[in-house]
Amino acid sequence: MKCPSCQHNGTRVLDSRPVDDGKSIRRRRECESCHYRFTTFEKVEETPLIVVKKEGVREEFSREKMLRGLIKACEKRPVSLKTLEDMCFDIEKELRNQGCSEVKSELVGEMVMDRLAKIDEVAYVRFASVYRQFKDINVFIDELKDLIKKER
């Protein structure tokens, strides 16, 4: 690796340690020529996961976007941010483990709703009402009936 100070091509690693829950490695380096010390970070470059929307539009998967939707659905509910972050992480991990570079938004939405129904039913209904675009109260009632059936 080139030294940022003198541009010499030889550096040695003084210290390495995992950071960001093991997703990255922090390395302390020293230039063999000028002895300048600097830090580098190394992490795996992930293949982007593409979400295909209902209209056919493609966009890169965003765990942050999914988390924002969940936070909105769980507003004023006894669901911790950690629980929601873990859910988002698990969903992303499951999607990536499928080995596909593209996933349908419907699959992502169903995965969110399956998990949310087990965590908080009110948040589930809130999320489902936006995700499934309930047109009237009857659709809302049908969803509640389905939820009650699943409980029994």
From Swiss-Prot:
Domain spans labelled ATP-cone: 49-139
Taxonomic superkingdom: Bacteria
Phenotype upon loss of function: Suppresses the synthetic lethality of a dnaA1-yabA deletion for growth on rich medium, increased levels of nucleotides in the cell, increased levels of DNA replication elongation.
A Pfam family matched in the record: Zn_ribbon_NrdR
Cofactor, free-text remark: Binds 1 zinc ion.
GO biological process: negative regulation of DNA-templated transcription
Needed cofactors: Zn(2+)
GO terms assigned for molecular function: ATP binding; double-stranded DNA binding; zinc ion binding
Xref: InterPro entries: ATP-cone_dom (IPR005144), NrdR-like_N (IPR055173), RNR_NrdR-like (IPR003796)
Assigned keywords, A-Z: ATP-binding, DNA-binding, Metal-binding, Nucleotide-binding, Repressor, Transcription, Transcription regulation, Zinc, Zinc-finger
Keyword Nucleotide-binding: yes
Entry annotated with the keyword NADP: no
ZnF segments: unnamed: 3-34
Transmembrane parts of this sequence: none
NCBIfam families xref list: transcriptional regulator NrdR
HAMAP family to which the protein is assigned, alphabetical: NrdR
Stated family: Belongs to the NrdR family.
Function: Negatively regulates transcription of bacterial ribonucleotide reductase nrd genes and operons by binding to NrdR-boxes.
Record protein name field: Transcriptional repressor NrdR
UniProt organism field: Bacillus subtilis (strain 168)
Gene designation per UniProt: nrdR
